[in-house]
Amino acid sequence: MLSVSEVNRRIAGLLERHFALGWVRGEISNFTRAGSGHWYFSLKDAGAQIRCVMFKGRNQYADFTPREGEAIEVRALVTLYEARGELQLSVEAIRRAGLGNLYEAFLRLKAALEAQGLFDAARKRPLPRHPHAIGVVTSLQAAALRDVLTTLHRRAPHVPVVVYPVPVQGAGAAERIAAMLDLVNARAEVDVIILCRGGGSIEDLWAFNEEPVARAVAASDIPIVAGVGHETDVTIVDFVADVRAPTPTGAAELVSPDRARMLRDVAGCWDALSATLRRQLDRRAQTVDWLARRLRSPQAQMRERRAGLAHLEGRLRFALHGRVQRAEHGQRLLAMRLDAARPDIARERTALQGIEAALARAMRATLDRAQTRLSHHQAGLELLAPQRTLERGYAVLLDAKGQAIRDPAALHARARIEARLARGAVDIEIAQVQPKLPEM
């Protein structure tokens, strides 16, 4: 009985004896450069493919590095990788055989679309800075979808995400992607579209190199960000899309506003607004102080009016006293003249009574005018009295210390104050402070 290892060794020996070193032509795919420096890739044609390895000691003499989809010729031995029982070509030499069919198709379509202006920068639209909703067109099984959703949730958890599932490789994938893009535009649910899938071979990504997808991207009314494959992968969609991202994660970062940055921007705007309001309040407070210095208080005006009234009263008393003295002096002179002339007593008494009556009338008129002026000034003082002001419907606002409140800036919501009225007082709780009253 043979072991598995023995079977594989015998098969490897048979292959090496029956397949001499020779040239094989095919199209390259799944090219990988290992950390050891070895090259691993597949060589295929329309009907089959085979794995190939070209060790570092051989590939260092190659004059080019193979690319996906490129047609090449290799000089190789048919061998068996015994550890896994896999058939492979051990490549000794490599040379170009011209561009592969896929790559030629890629170049033809690229040239045609570029000539039609589909790659022009002028037709590309800017991405919305703050999208209301983000659409993702990809396969539900794609690993890229998980990366995109994780990135969007981290950066912009407040933005809704709509996933539009569609196959991204295989037969008919291009037509279904194009139809889905048309549907997304018709539904108009999102502000920006991420068209993405993860990395893979040129065959895996080929749907994004087909004309239906390219034209659907160009016809979209909604901006599209292409995030197809890895950074080194280039597809037709990358040229037609409004923005090309190196990876699906990069596409998610491009379309999502950074929540932390937005919060910093809002904080900055709030600080600027607060500073502006503080400056305005400071200027208004300065204006109020300036007006307060110019405005005399009612108490000061009352003191001035009282002083003026006292001055008028003194002048009135002095004037009355002088008139009385002059009248008495005149009376004495008349008496002396009467004694000297010895007039008729009755006639002179009558004249004297007339003079006394005239003097009395003059004194009463003078006193009436003085009383009128005194009443006028008294009425003016009463108008300025705080009690009369309160009786006209006004109120005096006092803080907790009993001080009059002149500036609303000294108050705050829920503060308690006292309103002094003509016939009592009222306790008030502040609901809202308005720094400036509306014009009346």
UniProtKB/Swiss-Prot annotation:
The gene is xseA. The keyword Lyase does not apply. The keyword Disulfide bond does not apply. GO terms for cellular component: cytoplasm; exodeoxyribonuclease VII complex. One of its GO terms (biological process) is DNA catabolic process. Keywords: Cytoplasm, Exonuclease, Hydrolase, Nuclease. Heterooligomer composed of large and small subunits. It comes from Ralstonia nicotianae (strain ATCC BAA-1114 / GMI1000) (Ralstonia solanacearum). GO terms for molecular function: exodeoxyribonuclease VII activity; nucleic acid binding. It is an enzyme of class 3 (hydrolase). This is Exodeoxyribonuclease 7 large subunit. Bidirectionally degrades single-stranded DNA into large acid-insoluble oligonucleotides, which are then degraded further into small acid-soluble oligonucleotides. InterPro entries: Exonuc_VII_L, Exonuc_VII_lsu_C, OB-fold_nuc-bd_dom.
